[in-house]
Curated annotation (Swiss-Prot):
Xref: Pfam families: ADH_N, Glu_dehyd_C
Source organism of this protein record: Picrophilus torridus (strain ATCC 700027 / DSM 9790 / JCM 10055 / NBRC 100828 / KAW 2/3)
Protein name: Glucose/galactose 1-dehydrogenase
UniProt note: pH dependence: Optimum pH is 6.5 for the oxidation of D-glucose by NADP(+). At the physiological pH of 4.6 found in the cytoplasm of Picrophilus cells, the enzyme shows merely 10% of its maximal activity.
Presence of keyword rRNA-binding: no
Residue numbers binding NADP(+): 213-215, 273-275, 302-304, 347
Job description of the protein: Catalyzes the NAD(P)(+)-dependent oxidation of D-glucose to D-gluconate via gluconolactone. Is also significantly active with D-galactose as substrate, but not with D-xylose, L-arabinose, D-ribose, D-mannose, D-allose, D-glucosamine, 2-deoxy-D-glucose, or glucose-6-phosphate. Can utilize both NAD(+) and NADP(+) as electron acceptor, with a marked preference for NADP(+) (20-fold higher activity). Physiologically, may be involved in the degradation of both glucose and galactose through a non-phosphorylative variant of the Entner-Doudoroff pathway.
Entry EC number(s): 1.1.1.360
MF (Gene Ontology): D-glucose binding; galactose 1-dehydrogenase (NADP+) activity; galactose binding; glucose 1-dehydrogenase (NADP+) activity; glucose 1-dehydrogenase [NAD(P)+] activity; NAD+ binding; NADP+ binding; zinc ion binding
Length: 359
């Protein structure tokens, strides 16, 4: 028996209880979570809003959790030098058999036959212990990084998305005539933890960074936005920003997205990351299509990331952890016990990122 936070996918619901999970006869690594992160995907599952989520075969429940920093309890000899006492981040997606999955790019799975821990057919990390293979773990060498390393999983999404941007933006000369992005504007829709991580990375690219939402934000969020030299505006009260070169959406709301697509500069790039199957429909007419075509605007979706993106995420989190007064740590706004399952259905006030402390 193991204590776990579970749902019944795709129907939803959440509870913590002791459950029977078959233990492998042979395993490389036994892990205990230290912190697990909570995000919109977890809440969507609990509310029954993610129709693509499903239980692990053979079980009438699914253990939640795909963001985690864990400590190794036991480990057999392995080529990755993972040993007891190490801190590691487990990779979420597990490969199927398509060509991309076979080369470690399950983030670009060609046929959808992959699994995602805590989401699609594979138990997640919100439990007292679990087993895994060493190849699915990313080691955290700096013990001062343990808490902030819970942000590795969402940060790897950002690394992948900017890699996509690098590829797509090569269709034309994207930079200004000084060969930089210093005169280019990046607008990020949303003010959740993922949006902030996108803002951190956009700043690395030397964009002028803007964050927007349909409502005012609290003083803590405004303070962080200012600290990273970004700007915020409430698009329902202020004139829409014009002249956008890179638009990143974390909301999944089509009406909001197309509000700003119509403000894109020539050769602009739109990265669609947020998902929200319950978002209302929006109207798109021929002029919108003309606008996109005549300006060579690229709209591209980006999901998940490969193991290499986890490694890059750790590098940037280390940099941000030791720079600018460790402002990255301020994204973690609440630490809760596993029994506090109410946070899955009621978002804490002024939340950016809530995490669960397991030990």
């Amino acid at each position: 028996m193991v204590r776990a936070i579970i749902t019944n996918a795709p129907n939803g619901g959440v509870k913590i209880e002791n459950v029977n999970i078959n233990e492998p006869e042979h395993y490389e690594v036994k892990l205990r979570p230290v912190y697990t992160g909570l995000c919109g995907t977890d809440r969507g599952e609990v509310l029954g809003n993610l129709s693509f989520a499903y239980n692990e075969p053979g079980y009438n429940y699914l253990v939640l959790g795909h963001e985690a920093i864990c400590q190794v309890i036991e480990a057999s000899e392995n080529p990755y030098k993972i040993k007891p006492g190490d801190y590691v981040v487990p990779v979420v997606r597990r490969p199927g058999k398509c060509v991309n999955c076979r080369i470690g790019r399950e983030d670009d799975c060609s046929d959808g036959d992959k699994h995602e821990a805590g989401i699609t057919g594979l138990h997640g990390f919100m439990r007292d212990y679990f087993y895994d293979e060493a190849k699915n773990l990313v080691k955290i060498n700096d013990k001062n990084m343990v808490k902030v390393a819970v942000l590795t999983e969402p940060t790897k999404n950002v690394m992948k998305a900017f890699e996509v941007f690098d590829t797509v933006s090569k269709r034309s000369i994207f930079q200004g005539d000084d060969s930089t992005n210093l005169t280019k504007n990046c607008l990020i829709i949303g003010t959740g933890s993922e949006a902030f991580l996108y803002a951190f990375m956009a700043r690395e690219y030397r964009f002028n960074v803007f964050m927007t939402n349909r409502h005012p934000v609290g003083e803590e969020k405004l303070s962080i936005i200012s600290r990273i030299n970004a700007d915020f505006y409430d698009y329902t009260r202020e004139d829409p920003l014009k002249g956008i070169d890179l638009l990143i959406d974390t909301s999944g709301d089509p009406g909001t997205i197309f509000r700003f697509v119509r403000k894109m500069n020539y050769n602009g790039v739109v990265i669609l990351f947020g998902t929200n199957g319950r978002a209302p429909a929006t109207s798109i007419d021929g002029e919108d299509i003309d606008y996109i075509i005549e300006r060579n605007i690229s709209l591209v979706g980006s999901v998940d990331g490969a193991k290499r993106h986890y490694l890059r995420a750790v590098e940037y989190l280390e940099k941000w952890n030791y720079s600018e007064g460790s402002v990255i740590n301020r994204l973690i706004t609440g630490v809760f016990e596993p029994e506090d399952v109410s946070i899955f259905t009621k978002k804490p006030e002024n939340e950016i990122k809530s995490v669960i402390k397991w030990s």
